[in-house]
Swiss-Prot record:
Cross-link Cyclopeptide (Ile-Pro), sequence positions: 11-18
TM region positions: none
Modified residues ((3R,4R)-4,5-dihydroxyisoleucine): 11
Annotated organism of origin: Amanita exitialis (Guangzhou destroying angel)
NCBIfam families, alphabetized: amanitin
Key words of the record: Hydroxylation, Thioether bond, Toxin
Entry-annotated residues carrying 4-hydroxyproline: 18
Propeptide residue range(s): 1-10, 19-35
Tissues and organs where the protein is expressed, per its UniProt entry: Expressed in basidiocarps.
Name of this protein: Alpha-amanitin proprotein 5
GO molecular function terms attached to this record: toxin activity
């Protein structure tokens, strides 16, 4: 259940706040680059 909630929260945040969504996308991109 925690995985489902963790997946839905970012999507909800991006839908409500595009600016926050951009920041999250940048963090995810950086995380993938580090890996």
């Amino acid at each position: 259940m925690s995985d489902i909630n963790a997946t839905r929260l970012p999507i909800w945040g991006i839908g409500c706040n595009p600016c926050v969504g951009d920041e999250v996308a940048a963090l995810l991109t950086r995380g993938e680059a580090l890996c």
